[in-house]
């Protein structure tokens, strides 16, 4: 079986440039025939685009990670729009909501999360405009507030945009909320852990044509 690899960060400094060819060869030897490398900041985008131009089987998703919104200018969308029209950009992202990490210095949690939601909505607007999919990150210290908020925003655009919720951990009712909107779920190896019963249960009940695989490498 040939597998598409839904989510990695080949432009990360943890991958020395001279090792990329060998990495892609190992992936091919393990039946991974396509990869999507994701940008997480404006500065990160050119390197990701370059990788797609150098390798036929590498594609990109371009966006601003929620933990980077505080240092991303409010007019970011015009730059992102230009980049995202590259022919090998297949999605907008990685975007989303991260309530796990504390607000940076000078920001309250309320202001930080408000900007994340604003930027997520702008990413959705761009995806709708360009006819591209979107890749969503959510993370909470406890509970599922970020996922609930992201799903609520997705519901505003689900007739125009298909979302992939990456590194999905479950439980099944969260999966259903996303699947009901037409979204996809991307699972990591966590689904194989003995204690990750919610993740495994969600994966087992995700339709075959709505499931994706990843490692979020190198993280």
Which stretches of residues belong to each language-model region?
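Mid-domain alpha/beta scaffold segments of enzyme catalytic cores
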Residues: 1-219
């Amino acid at each position: 079986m040939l597998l598409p690899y839904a989510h990695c960060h080949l432009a990360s400094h943890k991958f020395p440039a001279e090792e990329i060819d060998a990495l892609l060869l190992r992936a091919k030897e393990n039946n991974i025939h396509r990869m999507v490398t994701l940008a997480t900041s404006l500065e990160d985008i050119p390197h990701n685009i370059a990788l797609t131009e150098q390798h036929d089987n590498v594609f990109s998703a371009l966006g601003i990670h929620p933990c980077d919104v505080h240092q991303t200018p409010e007019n970011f969308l015009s730059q992102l729009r230009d980049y995202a029209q590259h022919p090998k950009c297949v999605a907008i992202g990685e975007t989303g909501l991260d309530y796990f990490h504390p607000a940076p210095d000078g920001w309250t949690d309320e202001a930080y999360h408000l900007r994340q939601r604003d930027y997520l909505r702008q990413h959705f607007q761009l995806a709708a405009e360009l006819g591209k999919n979107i890749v969503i990150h959510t993370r909470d210290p406890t509970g599922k507030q970020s996922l609930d908020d992201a799903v609520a925003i997705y519901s505003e655009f689900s007739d125009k945009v298909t979302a992939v919720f990456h590194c999905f951990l479950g439980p099944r009712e969260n999966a259903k909320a996303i699947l009901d909107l037409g979204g996809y779920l991307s699972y990591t190896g966590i689904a194989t852990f003995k204690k990750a019963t919610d993740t495994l249960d969600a994966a087992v009940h995700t339709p075959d044509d709505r499931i994706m695989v990843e490692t979020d490498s190198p993280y």
